[in-house]
């Protein structure tokens, strides 16, 4: 197995698990009412974009763009790191590299989602809401980014055993 083949597999596992986390947190955020049970802060932070098919959901383009960014950016950033990580030093390195990649992806996805929403409203500028989108995306990634990080580290550890 080529080093790039395994590395792309690690990147895909990071991207797919990040996209699944985004979809799951969006669905959960739309199912839980933010003001009920005192969960408002946690639900708001764990939800990057609201599930588009809920009553109070964002338009579908917000969700799809955020999902595409969270899927593609970790693949682009994690695959080269997985290729260059040496055997025996892979677990923590891949975990932190993936968490950082998900953090970048979350910030970009949050900025894109609020930018699309701002473009749809006539009185708002995309540059005015960009910091809040970056903050929301980074907060989401800090809260749930460990899940794709652990999955990618596990896939990477299994890949190292196969190569050696």
Region spans (language model):
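Hydrophobic alpha-helical transmembrane segments
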Residues: 7-12, 61-84, 95-100, 110
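Alpha-helical transmembrane segments of multi-pass integral membrane proteins
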Residues: 105-164
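Transmembrane helix-loop junctions in multipass membrane proteins, especially transporters and channels
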Residues: 30-34, 82, 86-87, 118-122, ...
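Long, glycine/tryptophan/cysteine-rich extracytoplasmic
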Residues: 12-69, 124-136
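Cytoplasmic juxtamembrane regions at transmembrane-helix boundaries
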Residues: 1-6, 73-102, 160-164
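Aromatic-anchored segments of alpha-helical transmembrane domains
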Residues: 18-23, 102-112
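Hydrophobic core segments of alpha-helical transmembrane domains in multi-pass membrane transport
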Residues: 14-22, 73, 118, 146-151
């Amino acid at each position: 197995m080529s080093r790039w083949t395994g590395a792309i597999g690690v990147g895909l596992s990071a991207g797919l698990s990040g996209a699944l986390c985004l979809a799951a947190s969006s669905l959960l955020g739309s199912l839980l009412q933010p003001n009920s049970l005192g969960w408002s802060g946690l639900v708001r932070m764990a939800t990057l974009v609201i599930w588009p098919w809920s009553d109070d959901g964002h338009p579908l383009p917000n969700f799809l763009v955020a999902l595409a960014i969270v899927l593609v950016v970790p693949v682009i950033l994690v695959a080269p790191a997985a290729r260059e990580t040496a055997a025996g030093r892979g677990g923590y390195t891949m975990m932190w590299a993936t968490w950082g990649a998900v953090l970048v992806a979350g910030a970009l996805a949050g900025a894109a989602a609020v930018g699309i929403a701002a473009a749809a409203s006539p009185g708002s500028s995309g540059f005015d809401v960009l910091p809040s989108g970056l903050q929301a995306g980074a907060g989401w990634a800090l809260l749930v980014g460990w899940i794709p990080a652990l999955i990618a580290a596990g896939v990477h550890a299994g890949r190292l055993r196969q190569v050696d």
